[in-house]
Amino acid sequence: MELRVLLCWASLAAALEETLLNTKLETADLKWVTFPQVDGQWEELSGLDEEQHSVRTYEVCDVQRAPGQAHWLRTGWVPRRGAVHVYATLRFTMLECLSLPRAGRSCKETFTVFYYESDADTATALTPAWMENPYIKVDTVAAEHLTRKRPGAEATGKVNVKTLRLGPLSKAGFYLAFQDQGACMALLSLHLFYKKCAQLTVNLTRFPETVPRELVVPVAGSCVVDAVPAPGPSPSLYCREDGQWAEQPVTGCSCAPGFEAAEGNTKCRACAQGTFKPLSGEGSCQPCPANSHSNTIGSAVCQCRVGYFRARTDPRGAPCTTPPSAPRSVVSRLNGSSLHLEWSAPLESGGREDLTYALRCRECRPGGSCAPCGGDLTFDPGPRDLVEPWVVVRGLRPDFTYTFEVTALNGVSSLATGPVPFEPVNVTTDREVPPAVSDIRVTRSSPSSLSLAWAVPRAPSGAVLDYEVKYHEKGAEGPSSVRFLKTSENRAELRGLKRGASYLVQVRARSEAGYGPFGQEHHSQTQLDESEGWREQLALIAGTAVVGVVLVLVVIVVAVLCLRKQSNGREAEYSDKHGQYLIGHGTKVYIDPFTYEDPNEAVREFAKEIDVSYVKIEEVIGAGEFGEVCRGRLKAPGKKESCVAIKTLKGGYTERQRREFLSEASIMGQFEHPNIIRLEGVVTNSMPVMILTEFMENGALDSFLRLNDGQFTVIQLVGMLRGIASGMRYLAEMSYVHRDLAARNILVNSNLVCKVSDFGLSRFLEENSSDPTYTSSLGGKIPIRWTAPEAIAFRKFTSASDAWSYGIVMWEVMSFGERPYWDMSNQDVINAIEQDYRLPPPPDCPTSLHQLMLDCWQKDRNARPRFPQVVSALDKMIRNPASLKIVARENGGASHPLLDQRQPHYSAFGSVGEWLRAIKMGRYEESFAAAGFGSFELVSQISAEDLLRIGVTLAGHQKKILASVQHMKSQAKPGTPGGTGGPAPQY
């Protein structure tokens, strides 16, 4: 069966070719357009092909043409009929230049193919211009087989066949053009066609004939007749550009209830009479279960025979059953006011295992009428839903006759009509049992005991032998909470009670005839004892004192250990010192996935494979180097549904691209830290290949900061930097070098937690490049603004080069996403760094933070702080917020000369709006205009109160605008030199 399905798949998956033009089938002149109209141009001739059929051909042989001369041949307008990529198969012969006696240096053995798109047949003999633009070059075609021309003999040689690919096409049609620049050749035939995926039925899913418009096109399928979609995503398959269907469907369909798959899983067949299929799925039709039948084809359920039923909770495929017969051999044992009944199971259980029992009771007074039993009787464990064949009845009245009817029930008893069979038993109680005990009183109460007394009941005959006391705490439920006490006198003492608790008490008496019924519940309460409370307080005070002494001892021990640690060395504090970093015993070390002989083995070892049915893609949120980035949801069995980010691998990938795409997962899967993006798993067993990570609601840090410019306090920004440093400290301890640490590669969640990401690029330096940049494996260039100088010059990447990049990230955060080095070119950045220039402090940046940046930018990489020292320094700032109030001043005692980005003179701006956009406050342009601040003269007089009235409520934005206004005032003073005339940085 599987072989048959496989063969069916192979035959149906063949690509279809739709012909647009085939000159071998043309019988009349082609009349294609040539240019120029001179001797030696393309000439249309009639000839015979290999099968001796008449065909139209074009020949050209101008081997002594003037330099720059070209002969063009253009086909008629060809409608593309929905095709995006068109294939052109050329059959041609070409003479070898050496065999031509008159061939000059201009003789060639190649020709060029072009195409031109248009929405209608508008081309003329002169338009479009006969040149590469507007014509689009397809390829320069060289002959694989050359024909040799010997003197006095006919030319001999093989026919060349070449297939070219045109596109992508977007207009209604196109022309194909051939350019000859000195070849001697004959164009024997031209076949223009496009490929499409044939109609396909597989896995009970029908996919329509499809013309591919991309490398890989998803095609939605529809279920065949009497089939329904399987759980999960809608059925889909991928149509490749070459007209082949790619792999098996993502999901498929399954036959509806009452139908089974047939003919190689391509259609659904109705179940025959006497068979059924209860659910949709891959199963086949089954014979009807016991006591049921189906009289029609396509049955999803078999009907029960007369007298048989299915319970509502029974599956459709369950046998039909019947109610049980009556229980047998009921035996009664009477003990005063209590009765024990037990019986045997019925002869017929009805074919079910959910057998239960129930009792009905009637009581008859002496010489009186009968009625259903009252509520004073108790049944243990209950009057119905009994699993075991016994019950104890308590509270029987003396000298009463009781009739009990015991019935057996199962899951279909409620569906049956007619009387329910039962087994009766009659019991008459004695008249000598004592009556119920009442009038219970409390004679003494303490915190842990109650003393009770009651009146002696009058027994009809004989004396009371003893009493049974039943009591439990009020509110307590269940048999385990009830306690019993026997006493021979009409009093009792209940001990071991809770202080201040309420108890419910009942008493019954026993004579020679047995126990009488329990009387009414009596409510009693124990007392609260203050002396006992004082003792507890004393114990609490003593316990607290002991705990205090223990804490003092612990503090002393910790202090001694800290002093010893300080005496051994003080390099744990942040300083300029450097030393060798050693990985402690048991520390996990990063393993490069490319060291594996099979990189897929690294993916299997470090990343969890996720079933694609657990993944739901909701929307595309971006595009990455390898494909799209989406937001989706992950719902694994037994786990809570979570929001995830999904990276997909675009279609048409190579195996190398697939390995590099999945390498990020095998890297990420080795990390587990709250400030490192968490890998959820990978999908590699279906298309498209996916990497799933936790979803970070606020996206990349740089764009998030620019969007919220001025809305965070310094302490909040330092907290973000501390999280990034903590993640980098973890990576350094794992011996992993990031190489591309930048704010764009830091993700932020809804709680403002920053996490390091982007572990997927394998980077290398471009050779012989005048502007050194890092290039990814797929060609994406990475700016050098974040890269340490030794990494640029010597390709030396270490944790120290990551520390340099971290300093740039600090500058990005404190400037709310400003571009490092502004608009300077890469070469200018390199030159400035070589001359020891460094970035200045961002506006309102604390001095301590800018000094930490400068330490990270030390030219000697050994002098840069390591990440544990960076974390320690940031922790000190967070613990001492006052240190963050000292704001850095430009060139104020800096150890390096600082770059300067001067603001242009305000006269360089054409309007107030242009000025606002230049200082990145363009969001308030309309507010300024509405408030009447339309000139620089008015803006120069603006105050903080005016800004509030306009709607500038953020303190950071107010500072930025007022600082620029102050700068504007200084520029307007007489004798003050103007700005630089532009935003170009100076150093």
Swiss-Prot record:
Phosphorylated; autophosphorylation is stimulated by EFNB2. Glycans are attached at residues 203, 335, 426. Residues 965-987 are annotated as: Disordered. ATP binds at residues 621-629, 647. Disulfide bonds join 61-184, 97-107. It is found in: Cell membrane. Its main location: membrane. The active site is at residue 740. Residues 976-987 have a biased composition (Gly residues). It catalyses: L-tyrosyl-[protein] + ATP = O-phospho-L-tyrosyl-[protein] + ADP + H(+). Changing residue 346 to L: In a metastatic melanoma sample; somatic mutation. Gene3D superfamilies: ephrin a2 ectodomain, Galactose-binding domain-like, Immunoglobulins, Phosphorylase Kinase, domain 1, Transcription Factor, Ets-1, Transferase(Phosphotransferase) domain 1, Tumor Necrosis Factor Receptor, subunit A, domain 2. Changing residue 782 to S: In LMPHM7; loss of kinase activity. GO terms for biological process: angiogenesis; cell adhesion; cell migration involved in sprouting angiogenesis; ephrin receptor signaling pathway; heart morphogenesis; protein autophosphorylation. Changing residue 95 to R: Reduces binding affinity for EFNB2. Residues 323-432, 436-529 form the Fibronectin type-III domain. It is a single-pass type I membrane protein. GO terms for cellular component: cytosol; extracellular exosome; extracellular region; plasma membrane; receptor complex. The modification Phosphothreonine is found at residue 976. Residues 561-987 are cytoplasmic. Changing residue 268 to R: In CMAVM2; uncertain significance. It is linked to Lymphatic malformation 7: A form of primary lymphedema, a disease characterized by swelling of body parts due to developmental anomalies and functional defects of the lymphatic system. Patients with lymphedema may suffer from recurrent local infections. LMPHM7 is an autosomal dominant form with variable expressivity. Some individuals present with severe non-immune hydrops fetalis, which may cause perinatal demise or fully resolve after the neonatal period. Others present with no edema and have milder clinical features, such as atrial septal defect or varicose veins as adults. PANTHER family: EPH RECEPTOR A5 (PTHR46877), RECEPTOR PROTEIN-TYROSINE KINASE (PTHR46877:SF19). Heterotetramer upon binding of the ligand. The heterotetramer is composed of an ephrin dimer and a receptor dimer. Oligomerization is probably required to induce biological responses. Interacts with RASA1; the interaction depends on EPHB4 tyrosine-phosphorylation. This is Ephrin type-B receptor 4. It comes from Homo sapiens (Human).
